[in-house]
Every structure is written in structure tokens, then in C-alpha cells.
Amino acid sequence: MIRLYNSRTLQVEDFHPIHEGHVDMYVCGPTVYNYAHIGNARPMIVFDVLKRLLEAEGYTVTYVSNFTDVDDKIINKAAEEGTSEAEVAQRYIDAYQQVRRSLNTELPDITPRVTENMDGIIAFIDALVKNGNAYVTKGGDVYFSVESVPTYGEISHQKLDQLEAGASERVDETGAEKKNPYDFALWKMTDKGIKWDSPWGKGRPGWHTECVVMINNNLGEKIDIHGGGMDLKFPHHENECAQQEALHYNCLANYWVHNAMVNINGEKMSKSLGNTLWAQDVVNELGTNLTRWLVSSVHYRKELNFSDETIATARKEMDKVMKPLHQASVKRQLAGVKQSEGYDEAAYRAFLDCMDDDMNTPNAYAVIFDTVKKINQGLRTRDIDFETVDKLRKSVEKMLIILGITVKNPVVTEEDRKLFAAWNEAKAARDFAAADEARRQLMDRGLL
């Protein structure tokens, strides 16, 4: 039984999908005005792992993650570059998808764009106005009335009188006052940048409405899992939930899952500190496996720190896991033994049990290390039980698949066999120079 922490209830709950055997999951995607940083990469990995876990436990999954391709930042960048908003958005969408591929994430099944859902967004806003949950200012802007939804605050767990001042401006661009300082924009009138016709005049939609409509259009009025970074709980997810409550009388998703933030050398990553790490640069430097291992080494609800120390620790841990897997494969091949038919089901089940417990990756890593320890013990015996060792190896590789980490075991050739024989002969003859040279060649080939 998979259990997930639900931000809405503040509890770890048994997971029961709406439709037996199938899961609908939506994760908020990026506003595409710049390249993805490592903070953007964390939810890519977290929810990719969750999807893999759900599938390993027998569910089919429809995974949707959007692109916000209309926004003031996109418009400003297009103006600076003398190009179109569409060209700016497409450039960063392409780059974002490349990061996903570089991270070995399974691409979402559906990646809707705001600009492709404008008719539905306008219709949704119009319904909110007619339902009395939204109002139109004299300047033609449309705002959602947070006081019209008694449950407002159920995601962030804040009452209206407890919310931080400044979470939403009191006055809009035209100077018309809001009825409540926390009312948020559904539609903004503008004469700048890309805009659409609406019942209230030409303008653009507010951010919070876009995701609700894309969920409804692609998955329906209620889904199983809504995911995203912790920073989206308020106001974005709170405001999504409020709009859905207003029109469809539900909170959009049964499980609200949020990952914590990424720090750089113990400090919050921010443009002002100049410590932004671009995701593609990280993958290029560390590689896919090490990046994913580091990100998953910390529970997804705890802050993740990127530093030289945490990278070094992750690299040592990866070596501790990968080397025995390679050695087990090489020694089996040298002995002329076929691969085992199955895997160690008990070890794999222990790993899944940890992952099923709110994706407890630290405990799951402990299972990996324990299984690797057994592989090492098996390889140190005089007469290796290759069947047992190989089942352990295959169970670890299945664990790593859920973490999105790939294992490429070396294939031993006839030339490799001769080199191993030469190494052993040199050691037996105490010809240390020849032995060292043979060992170096074996290491270069990834066989030691």
C-alpha cells in the first residue's frame, strides 16, 4: 500500500486512486522565460520517481505537466530581444525538455500550453463571474473573490486574517481597488504584448486559472495527485483549489504533494545571490546518475543542499553501489555462468516497502546498501554462489530503475579474458610491473 503525505490534511495517508488501477497526476510546469535551474529539476525527478513507483506497484499513470507560455516575463524578454513571445517560449520549452531527457525522466504523457487552452480559460472565468465568485473592475480586469469560498486556506492552512500582507496587491494596474487585498487576478486588461479578446476586453489570463483549466481539460474535474514545489502551496495551489471549489465543489485533487526547496552551499538559491545552478550544467558536470542519486538521497519533503561536500558524498555512495554490481557481472561472465532467471524478491520488496512509505528514499537507500553488502560478501567467498549473487545484483538494478538510475554492466570479450589471465599470471609470478599494467588496462575498460 502506497502512502503519501497530503499537504491538504497534513497527514501521511493510504493512497486510493479515484479509478481502480489508474492514477491521474498533474505537476505544475515552468513559466518558460529562462533555462531550468536545479530547483526546477527537483520536481522533475521527484515526480518521475513517484510515477515509476506507481507503475512498479501495478498502476497505470497519466502524467500531465504544463508549460506556461504567456507571462509578463516572457513578453518582456521578447521585447528585449526583438522577437515574438512564441519564439521565446519555444526556445525554453525545447531546453526544458532537453533537461528532462538528460535527467532520464520519462516525459509527461501530456504537456499542455496556456496558449492552446485560451477558449477554456475565458469560459471558466466567465462562469466564475456569473456564479458570483468573481467580479469585473471598471477597467475591465477580473478578480476572484476569496471570501466567496468558505474553505479558502485549506492548502496553505492559513486563515484570511493570517495571510502575509503583500501576497496580493491591493490595487491593480488601472488603480481600481480590489474588494479584498487577497483577491487575485483572473484576467488582466492590457495593450502590451500578446493578448486575447474576451467578454471584458483584450487581455491575458491570471496564472492561477490556467492550471485549473488545463487539469479539467486533460484529466477531468478531480484528479488523484497534484504536485509541485513547496513554494507553490500559496498562493498558486491555494488559488487553484479555491476556483475549483467555487465551480465544481471539490478541491481539484485528492492528494496534494509538494517537494521542498534546493539550497546552494546552505543558502537559498536566488538571482540576487548569484548562486543559480542551471540544471543542464549540473547534469553535464555530474552526469545523469550522480545528479539523480544526489537529489533522491534526501527525502523529498526536506530541503536539499547542493555543495562540494554533498556531491562528494553522493559520488562515494554511487561508487559503493556500482562497483559491486559491475564486479558481480564481470566475475559471472569470466566463470562462464549464465544470468539468473529471477531476482531477490525479498530485497526488492523491502526497497518497495520503503518507497511506498511516502517515498522514503533514505530508508530505501539503506536497503540498497544492505543488498550491495551481501553481494560483496558473496564475491569474497572461495566458491562464489553465482546464482544467489546474480539475483541480488538484479534486485539492486530493479531498485535503481525506480530511482531513474541506469546500470551499464561491461560485456567481457575474449580479449578481456586474456587480459585477466595475464593479470593473474603476472601476480602469481610476482611481476608487479606487468600486473600493474594489466590492472590499469582492465580499469580503463571498466572491468575492475
Q: Where are the predicted features?
A:
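The substrate-binding groove and active-site-proximal loops of carbohydrate-active enzymes
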Residues: 79-85, 109-115, 229
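N-terminal, positively charged, Ser/Thr/Ala/Gly-biased leader segments
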Residues: 98-132
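An acidic site on a long C-lobe helix of protein kinase domains
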Residues: 92, 116-120, 364
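Short phosphate-binding/catalytic loops that engage adenosine nucleotides
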Residues: 59, 133, 447
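Alpha-helix C-terminal capping/helix-coil junction sites
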Residues: 55, 101, 129-130, 257, ...
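Alpha-helical recognition segments enriched in aromatics with Gly/Pro capping
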Residues: 1-33, 48, 119-329
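Structural preference for alpha-helix termini/caps and helix-kink/transition segments
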Residues: 268, 277-448
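N-terminal, positively charged nucleic-acid-binding surface of large information/translation enzymes
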Residues: 9-12, 18-106
